[in-house]
Amino acid sequence: MSRYRGPRLRIIRRLGELPGFTSKTTTRTSSPGQHGGSNFAKSSAYGIRLQEKQKLRFNYGITERQLLSYVKKAKRMKGSTGEVLLQLLEMRLDNVVFRLGMAPTVVAARQLISHGHIVVNDQKVTIPSYACQVKDVISVRAKNNSRKMVTEANSTATANVPSHLSWNKESLVGVVNKVIDRKDVGLQLNELLVVEYYSR
């Protein structure tokens, strides 16, 4: 399944606030569609699990295949599968760039990385799914256009940098200090329902 490229407000009306997906908000409380969406998806156990799974997909900008791969990897690792899954997604380079305020959304962060504007430990990295590690240093290439794009994005960033990261606004350098705590994940969802969805 490919990444979503349709209207973003339609998605957040259905799933709620998704900071990595869009900074836009909506005042409409009904689900999209002529009759406000189907009640089946809201009330059935399957529908609720599907909705939580979709929150992860859209917020982190990943495909169904990628999410399934992360779930399988989380199951092989120590700890709560749901919490480990969130940690794996949060440590993706595109998400770290977004959480540092270097880009307004995960999609924008992915473009920065793909176009060669981001450096990790003094090496240019162009793979958005690159798994960041503790003590990784994320910075901007020493090119005027690269620094300008990040500076502009950072000046309009509204979210605070989470405690597992640190950010120097003057030098445009960020550091991964530790693995993220569950309370710092900027998304309202029940990750256990996502694990249950893939355990069917």
UniProtKB/Swiss-Prot annotation:
Residues 91-154 form the S4 RNA-binding domain. The keyword Ribosomal protein applies. InterPro entries: Ribosomal_uS4 (IPR022801), Ribosomal_uS4_bac-type (IPR005709), Ribosomal_uS4_CS (IPR018079), Ribosomal_uS4_N (IPR001912), S4_RNA-bd (IPR002942), S4_RNA-bd_sf (IPR036986). GO terms for molecular function: rRNA binding; structural constituent of ribosome. Its main location: plastid. The keyword Ubl conjugation does not apply. It is found in: Plastid, Chloroplast. Keywords: Chloroplast, Plastid, Ribonucleoprotein, Ribosomal protein, RNA-binding, rRNA-binding. Gene3D superfamilies: Ribosomal Protein S4 Delta 41, Chain A, domain 1, RNA-binding S4 domain. It holds the Pfam family Ribosomal_S4. Belongs to the universal ribosomal protein uS4 family. Part of the 30S ribosomal subunit. Contacts protein S5. The interaction surface between S4 and S5 is involved in control of translational fidelity. One of the primary rRNA binding proteins, it binds directly to 16S rRNA where it nucleates assembly of the body of the 30S subunit. This is Small ribosomal subunit protein uS4c. It comes from Oltmannsiellopsis viridis (Marine flagellate). The gene is rps4.
